[in-house]
Amino acid sequence: VVVLTFNVAVDAIKENSEIQEHYHGSHELHSRWIILVWFILINYITVHLSYSLWESVMAVHMTNMGIPFYAYSMLWTLNGVLIIIGQPLVNKLSPYVRLSTQIIVGIFIFALSFLLLIFARTLTAFVIDFVILTIGEMTSFAGLPAWIAQLTNVDEAGHYQGLLNIMMSVGRAIGPLYGGFVIEKGSYQFLFISVFCLMTGTLIIICLYLWHLHRVQRRLNLDK
């Protein structure tokens, strides 16, 4: 069973090591890539803080608009069906789109769905918005552990991938509390704007720092 089931592809390990060498280049850059990983982890907190709103306050928001609760429940069925159908299609993007680009675009689409909630008043609008959210989820979430593995050394990849799961739990724990507090002090519209700003703000920091690191890496390569 071990021989047949748990074979490890040596070529895959070699390929992953080459990708890591491309990212790190030297020990000098390694600590900077780790800073980027922490920016990604912080962004992941904001993503799941926002996602948890759909599991908590959004049910109340939709029923307050006269939409029956069963319709809210059906949105999660739609989410599951779309992921089952769409995830294999998204995976086919990998030969054509850089992983970091795919994840950044996916998180932005995910964040955009919360901004569009400001204008949602009917069940159709909520369905369209949830489809947009699911597209962002499919495009970004599955690739994050692989991106973390590219940005870290082999001996520390598991540590940071574990932190990714911890940050997800932190975001889900904070989300309902944050949502209830903002709604009590403000409104649902302000809540949607605030989580959009949290996600896009940290995403912009990731993009700027990633651009800076690529510039530094190119300069170091030219100096060799």
Identify the function of each model-found stretch.
Residues 69-70, 152-164:
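Loop-to-transmembrane helix entry/capping segments in MFS-fold secondary transporters
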